[in-house]
From Swiss-Prot:
InterPro entries: Asn/Gln-tRNA_amidoTrfase_suB/E (IPR017959), Asn/Gln-tRNA_Trfase_suB/E_cat (IPR006075), Asn/Gln_amidotransferase (IPR018027), Asn/Gln_tRNA_amidoTrase-B-like (IPR003789), GatB (IPR004413), GatB_C_1 (IPR042114), GatB_Yqey_C_2 (IPR023168), Gln-tRNA_amidoTrfase_suB_CS (IPR017958). It comes from the Bacteria. Belongs to the GatB/GatE family. GatB subfamily. GO terms for molecular function: asparaginyl-tRNA synthase (glutamine-hydrolyzing) activity; ATP binding; glutaminyl-tRNA synthase (glutamine-hydrolyzing) activity. Pfam families: GatB_N, GatB_Yqey. This is Aspartyl/glutamyl-tRNA(Asn/Gln) amidotransferase subunit B. NCBIfam families: gatB, PRK05477.1-2, PRK05477.1-4, PRK05477.1-5. PANTHER family: GLUTAMYL-TRNA GLN AMIDOTRANSFERASE SUBUNIT B MITOCHONDRIAL AND PROKARYOTIC PET112-RELATED, GLUTAMYL-TRNA(GLN) AMIDOTRANSFERASE SUBUNIT B, MITOCHONDRIAL. It is an enzyme of class 6 (ligase). The gene is gatB. Gene3D superfamilies: 1.10.10.410, GatB domain, N-terminal subdomain. It catalyses: L-glutamyl-tRNA(Gln) + L-glutamine + ATP + H2O = L-glutaminyl-tRNA(Gln) + L-glutamate + ADP + phosphate + H(+); L-aspartyl-tRNA(Asn) + L-glutamine + ATP + H2O = L-asparaginyl-tRNA(Asn) + L-glutamate + ADP + phosphate + 2 H(+). It comes from Persephonella marina (strain DSM 14350 / EX-H1). Keywords: ATP-binding, Ligase, Nucleotide-binding, Protein biosynthesis.
Length: 474
């Protein structure tokens, strides 16, 4: 029997505010344990939370970027559960009146656009961190109270690849709008996967399993692939899927049982009496909408329409904010040939950076270097082949292409008279080949071009060489 996976993601995004969600403690990754805490985030009796306005602004910004409807009224609620790293005995979250609902993200899976609907986006505070060492457990409350957005998708994803693409697109949007660095390694973006299987063609959902706290895009894909295989194996044998929470073991590539899945009523949600309902005016929402930068999809569309890039090239460039910024800086230096600039970035620079493990923001090849290189080729000062040599040298030394061309004497010979003399000399030295060419062996054109290039150490302008050869071999 063929099964179809039904996947929804719950993504927690840590907002890049300077201070926590309900107090003035600073947010500092890697600080000494329990140094950025106060009576509010420690849950001391009598301490009162106050909402961070910047966190609210960032959450509204994210909601609008994800095409959500932002509600003029939302309410903070207490989510009650007991954990050593939850000092108040409850988490401030939102329940039946979230900040925003009904959004979507479009992703491209196998060249087909799929719309993944977003059920809701709500604000909440993070818990602290429990570190287990031997027979001891240590609690660090520096993270407690950090502002989070929980972004819950509808179960519209149908493959492990689709889930990964959705997550990557979500991270990209968060970075573009500047509300989060969304670095999974630092825990700034955390993902829980809800997955069930159903027979293909059926509408009814199967029993849902949740996989908690997966901390990389690759592991999200691997965890889903394994879970699809595990559930399909059970169903084919006539077994039943248990509704539960599982964890993913990165070493074995398998999921394992964590606990039985809670229902919402287990958390006994109720409105937080210490926080007044959040009322947002339409004017404030519009003000934030106007402050949104150009988003990845809009940018890609502009690259295709205005700069005449292919859809593929545009998507590769906008898939990373720093990459798009690099491209735009290069085009601002030399705007005559954006297609060639895109080609050099995608086909040469990205591969080299990946090889060396360098981020594009730290690239030794700067945007102005790529612009200058393309300009040198367009003007006929160097050939594309020499351009690759120059690029390698720029990457090694950080020198400008012009400097390298001058230092190494790589400037292309574009003097027609000079090239004509060399072509005539080559033809005079190979009379037999000339006769064969004139008798119909057109393949010898490559031989003549090669001889001219050899004589000029690859510096002759290939277009001129071809033009003069065709004239003289008529």
């Amino acid at each position: 029997m063929e099964f179809e996976p039904v996947i929804g993601l719950e993504v927690h995004v840590q907002m890049s505010t300077n201070t926590k969600c309900f107090c003035s403690c600073k947010i500092e990754f890697g600080a000494e344990p329990n140094t950025n805490v106060c009576p509010v985030c420690l849950g001391m009796p009598g301490s009162l939370p106050v909402l961070n306005k910047k966190a609210l602004e960032y959450a509204i910004k994210a909601s609008l970027a994800l095409n959500c409807e932002v509600h003029e009224l939302s309410v903070f609620a207490r989510k009650n559960y007991f954990y050593p790293d939850l000092p108040k005995g409850y988490q401030i979250s939102q329940y039946d009146k979230p900040l925003a609902t009904n959004g979507y993200i479009d992703i491209k899976v196998n060249d087909k656009t799929e719309r993944i609907r977003i059920h809701r986006l709500h604000m909440e505070e993070d818990a602290g961190k429990t570190i287990h060492k031997g027979s001891y457990s240590y609690v660090d409350l520096n993270r407690a109270g950090t502002p989070l957005m929980e972004i819950v998708s509808e179960p519209d994803i149908r493959s492990a690849v689709g889930a990964r693409l959705y997550l990557e697109k979500l991270r990209n949007i968060m970075r573009y709008i500047g509300v989060s660095d969304a670095d999974m390694e630092k825990g700034q973006l955390r993902c829980d996967v809800n997955i069930s299987l159903r027979p293909k063609g059926e509408e009814k959902f199967g029993t849902k399993v949740e996989i908690k706290n997966i901390n990389s895009f690759r592991f999200v894909q691997k965890a889903i692939e394994y879970e699809i295989e595990r559930q399909a194996r059970i169903l084919r044998k006539g077994g039943e899927i248990v509704q539960e929470t599982r964890l993913f073991d990165e070493k074995t590539g398998k999921t394992f049982t964590m606990r039985t899945k809670e229902e919402a009523h287990d958390y006994r949600y109720f409105p937080d009496p210490d926080l007044i309902p959040v009322r947002i005016t339409k004017e404030y929402i519009e003000e934030i909408r106007k402050s949104l930068p150009e988003l990845p999809d809009q940018k890609a569309e502009r690259y295709v329409k205005e700069l005449k890039l292919t859809e593929y090239d545009a998507e590769v460039l906008v898939a990373d904010k720093d990459r798009a910024l690099f491209f735009e800086k290069a085009v601002s230096v030399y705007s005559e040939n954006p297609k060639s600039i895109a080609n050099w970035i995608i086909n040469e620079l990205l591969g080299k950076l990946n090889e060396e493990g360098i981020e594009i923001s730290n690239s030794p090849v700067r945007p102005e270097h790529i612009a200058e290189l393309v300009q040198l080729i367009d003007k006929g000062d160097i050939s594309s082949k020499i351009g690759k040599e120059v690029f390698e040298e720029v990457f090694k030394t950080g020198k400008s292409p012009k400097t390298i061309v001058e230092e190494k004497g790589l400037k292309q010979v574009s003097d027609e008279g000079e090239i004509r003399k060399i072509v005539e000399e080559v033809l005079n030295n190979h009379p037999a080949e000339v006769e064969k060419y004139k008798a119909g062996n057109q393949k010898l054109m490559g031989f003549f071009v090669g001889q001219v290039m050899k004589a000029t150490r690859g510096k002759a302008n290939p277009k001129l060489v071809n033009k003069i050869l065709q004239e003289l071999l008529k």
